[in-house]
Amino acid sequence: FESVELLENMSGYHLFAGSPGVGKTSMIAKLALTKAAEIGEANVAIVSLRDNRIGAWNQIQLLSGQAGVESYKANNEESLKIILQELSNKKLVLIDTSGAESLFVNSLKVQNIDLKKHLIISADCSEAAIARYFENNETWNSLLISKYSETASVWPVINALMNKSTPLSIANENVDLQTPLRKLKIRDLVIKNLKNMQLSLF
């Protein structure tokens, strides 16, 4: 079982994928807020990539403002490349994506940019839904869990992590920016779910 200390080691360019409504934008905003407190607001930026959903850009701007960081919009890969070049002085750039294009996102490459790619899934996601993100042997730098609670049964997530080499990193319990992100280890996740199973038997 693998886990990764994403928050402690986070720098450079990080791109996030996941289904629509999974909570990508709020997770990214929390990451931005957390890291801005450590390295300074001027050193962090959020980029929205190819997300043309109604209200999506407004939400990015709102949450970026609450996190105290700048936000940018890239309509395609070429504009993303230009924006990332302009942001080369930033210590951390977080890239939000359209939930409808997660598999495209995994194969995305930007010349001269080392893009770390992360998958965000909901705690109640089914194993079949998770498998879709690995069906073409996609690899992700880490997996993040949204809508997490200690009472949630996350066996599908655990099974998916056991079958793939994707390390677990952090979890988000709710959309409130002031609720801190949680570092998660696979072993702790398994133990917690085993305890929940035992409690449910009584």
What are these regions (language model features)?
Residues 57-58:
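Short, surface-exposed alpha-helical segments at coil->helix boundaries
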